[in-house]
Amino acid sequence: PQGYSYITQIGTGNYNEKTSELYTDYSFITADLGIGEEASNVFQNLAVQKLTETTEKMLVAPLRFKSVLLDEMDRVINAAKLGRPASMILKNNSISDRDIILKLEEASCAGVRIDMIVRGICCVRAEVPGKTENLHIRSLVGRYLEHGRIYSFYDGVTTRIYIASGDFLTRNTECRVEVGVRVEDPVLIQKLSNILQLQLRDNVNAREMRADGSYQKVKAAPGEPLVNGQMDMYDLLRDDWLARDAAPAAEPEQPEIKASERPSEPETRPEPVQVAEQPAEPAKQPATVKATPAPAVQSAPAPHAVDRAERHGHPSLFQRLHDWLRR
């Protein structure tokens, strides 16, 4: 409705007080009107046990989640067929959806570079000749539990990034109500891209899948610096937070007055009018004041001292005490 404003939070996890000490997630808070209206519509549909069928900015499973991601993969595949450097980076917990797996095989055969960071269940083989030779899968297991979902698609021109609550499991894409959103802020896109690249360089907690389905721990080459994706990301976010606290508060911008809005000056200025000087009046003599002696003040009993006995002609207790003290 007109006049309404929304603040919407879309996250890859929840606010569980126990798991929040271990899980790492991503949260997107926005005042975007379109996202707010669509999120409100999702809750209204849930209240009447109805599925959300149409959205413009949000991903909403089971009807508008997988289809959007498959469209993004098709866009990258078409870019690769045109000879552009196309790639995808997909980070989630698990993958088992058959449609997505087949689309990843198609993308790999088209020459798309695919990097996946999958912590748990993974039903697709990496680096299989003729099928997934351009698909590379790694898992990160370290101090924190990787729980975030980030889906990045690059078509050789632009990078489109989504965060979502749902994995690539069939139960998420077809059987649950999951949500996601495309991140359009260039600063946030760069930050998420940096996080993904940092985890792809990890040589402390990472294990990579081989063609036979086994995993091999990634080790740093001789002389290569150690990269701990989790702790380096912690340092990155901490430094960014401290830099924000140390930065001086921005002063409010003053509205710029356009030349057309400024008051125009008159072409001819009026000459000042001369006023004839008036002769000064002689100073008046101060009036003399004679002091008169003040009348003597006699003490009298307070009005409240007159009690009921005095009203009947008898001296009151207060009057008798007053007379005794004056003796």
Kindly give the residue locations of the regions a language model identified.
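Gly-rich Lys/Arg/Thr-decorated short loops/hinges at beta-loop-alpha junctions or inter-strand turns
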Residues: Q49-M58, G83-P85
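PLD/PLD-like phosphodiesterase catalytic module centered on the HKD motif
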Residues: P1-S20, I29-G36, P62-R327
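Prokaryote-biased recognition of long, low-complexity C-terminal linker/tail segments
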Residues: E21, G34-T52
